[in-house]
């Protein structure tokens, strides 16, 4: 199977509509919850565990929706949105790699550390996700470590992010 190794915002939004991957019903969130503008690289065999990598970027602009409400007079990107982007990318990796069809759901993470913040004057957020484990049985689970950088400075780190692919989410 031939796969792309980078994706534009338009292609990511096609994933939100269920149009990019014909083999799966997994989707990314649509705007405004899609937390990256492009995937700059995705490979099945990268990273220190040899399980794959996915890197993405978000262009920061002062008019991004979250700056207007979090917080009034003290605008900052909510930390949970950066963490959610890491789960989004982990789920995208599973779908891209051909995991069985399913609906992606965040299952948790082992450790999260915030050491900085994203302010409206920042220019670029970069996400680097390294897959550490993929279980492909009845339930597909991906596990990853990730970091988030703002203007080339690491400010978030997450270890053992877990995403599951469910055939049915009614009892989840």
Curated annotation (Swiss-Prot):
Belongs to the thioester dehydratase family. FabA subfamily. It is found in: Cytoplasm. This is 3-hydroxydecanoyl-[acyl-carrier-protein] dehydratase. Transmembrane segments: none annotated. Necessary for the introduction of cis unsaturation into fatty acids. Catalyzes the dehydration of (3R)-3-hydroxydecanoyl-ACP to E-(2)-decenoyl-ACP and then its isomerization to Z-(3)-decenoyl-ACP. Can catalyze the dehydratase reaction for beta-hydroxyacyl-ACPs with saturated chain lengths up to 16:0, being most active on intermediate chain length. One of its GO terms (cellular component) is cytoplasm. It comes from Xylella fastidiosa (strain Temecula1 / ATCC 700964). It comes from the Bacteria. GO terms for biological process: unsaturated fatty acid biosynthetic process. It catalyses: a (3R)-hydroxyacyl-[ACP] = a (2E)-enoyl-[ACP] + H2O; (3R)-hydroxydecanoyl-[ACP] = (2E)-decenoyl-[ACP] + H2O; (2E)-decenoyl-[ACP] = (3Z)-decenoyl-[ACP]. Pathway: Lipid metabolism; fatty acid biosynthesis. InterPro entries: FabA, FabA_FabZ, HotDog_dom_sf. The active site is at 70. Keywords: Cytoplasm, Fatty acid biosynthesis, Fatty acid metabolism, Isomerase, Lipid biosynthesis, Lipid metabolism, Lyase. GO terms for molecular function: (3R)-hydroxyacyl-[acyl-carrier-protein] dehydratase activity; trans-2-decenoyl-acyl-carrier-protein isomerase activity.
């Amino acid at each position: 199977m031939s796969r792309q190794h980078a994706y534009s915002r338009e292609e990511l939004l096609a994933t939100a509509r269920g149009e990019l991957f014909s083999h799966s019903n997994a989707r990314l969130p649509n705007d405004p919850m899609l937390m990256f503008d492009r995937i700059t690289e995705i490979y099945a065999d990268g990273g220190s565990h040899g399980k794959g990598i996915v890197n993405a970027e978000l262009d920061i602009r002062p008019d991004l929706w979250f700056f207007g409400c979090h917080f009034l007079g003290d605008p900052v990107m909510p930390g949970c949105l950066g963490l959610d982007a890491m789960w989004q990318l982990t789920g995208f990796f599973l779908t891209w790699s051909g995991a069985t069809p399913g609906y992606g759901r965040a299952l948790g993470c082992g450790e999260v550390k915030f050491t900085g913040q994203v302010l409206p004057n920042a220019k670029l957020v970069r996400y680097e996700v390294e897959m550490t484990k993929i279980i492909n049985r009845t339930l597909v689970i991906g596990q990853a470590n990730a970091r988030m950088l703002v203007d080339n400075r690491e400010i978030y780190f997450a270890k053992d992010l877990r995403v599951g692919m469910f055939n049915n989410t009614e009892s989840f």
